[in-house]
């Protein structure tokens, strides 16, 4: 179909969808704005961003995600708490009810691509009942040109119906909400949730299955940027570790902020947009992202808005702390328009260690890099409402466990091979606490973290001297421009050295306990890192 075509009930027969009312084919942003306002789905805020509410779900419904247990993918999926099996017959029955639900409804289609690389991009189609979800898909995925739309044949389709609910007793779901991926039918169905992030992350899960399994392309939950000389850096990290902040640097161009592939040519963005957390966002700390909240085309999820003045309050968490902005990457200055870069020179693994015992930066051997990649460690501090003040260790393998469909060892082996082949420098960066655990020490200054990352990327650290950390076996630099020397070794800034030793030992034990699950699939050298 052409850009902004409208048909009455025709064009979706291949998906089993007949008798829909108006079908809007890849409508542009301005048309979607008109539809969103007309249908009461959102408000246009001061300076043009669109404010919407997601209702009951203000984040991913992790317990409602399934993968259909069918012969083509059954033996490759890493089944467990994350990848739950779903009965094929139940899927077919649920899907038939969904298609019946769409009778007489207006639908919004976005035909686009997942992946910036022409070699590996996946043609996709997003069919949505909400106009703002169609705008979200338009923002987040790679847009097709007018010529490409003429012959667009989706290889995966997302059908997103927030107002359609499952019946758990009949459908075999856990609740009325569901996100189900069917690799045999190349289909994702979503119902019972208006949280748009489910669209993005379901396609990420699809790519995390297809690319490593079929094309030996490393799929990564990471940000990436490139320097003036073309040197690429990849930043792995869980939420809250500084992935977006540290990859946004004035002297480097952004390739992408969240999802990437690494093939024989280099790194490429999976997306055409960004989905940034914006709670307490300020113009001073994050000027580029702040400006996107004032731009036409940006979607502001669950952000407080004055309905009279239409001004937004980014500090208001009345609806959720997980307020988000979805915007095309072109809203950000200093980007790589192609979404592609060369092979990484540096890989940085970010952690926010609330125990305060990991160094602010350390050089990793290839074996240590594998260990920390498989561990995916960070630490969180629970909210005061729960009465918990002690840090809690979190391990999310490959820095993105909820989205990894294959066994973690598949991704680890791909990363190991690429690090070796391209002689990549690997670093562990702790953006968490220093001088003591949470409640005693203080958060690492962002200025120090930026200086350390810059020194790693420009070669300053590699050219200097290192000392061996006695607890974690890490190489710690002896000096870094712009960072006090005593900060570099975490033990030095703890007033109570015995407390440091005990806390560090406890964290080592947490690492070891978590890593037991991987020992059978790694070399002895990796298994014995800690």
From Swiss-Prot:
It is found in: Cytoplasm. Keywords: ATP-binding, Cytoplasm, Decarboxylase, Gluconeogenesis, Lyase, Manganese, Metal-binding, Nucleotide-binding. GO terms for biological process: gluconeogenesis. Mn(2+) binds at residues 201, 221, 258. The keyword Cytoplasm applies. GO terms for molecular function: ATP binding; metal ion binding; phosphoenolpyruvate carboxykinase (ATP) activity. ATP binds at residues 201, 221, 237-245, 286, 324, 449. Its EC number is 4.1.1.49. It holds the Pfam family PEPCK_ATP. One of its GO terms (cellular component) is cytosol. Pathway: Carbohydrate biosynthesis; gluconeogenesis. Its cofactor is Mn(2+). InterPro entries: PEP_carboxykinase_ATP, PEP_carboxykinase_C, PEP_carboxykinase_N, PEPCK_ATP_CS. Belongs to the phosphoenolpyruvate carboxykinase (ATP) family. This is Phosphoenolpyruvate carboxykinase (ATP). It comes from Geotalea uraniireducens (strain Rf4).
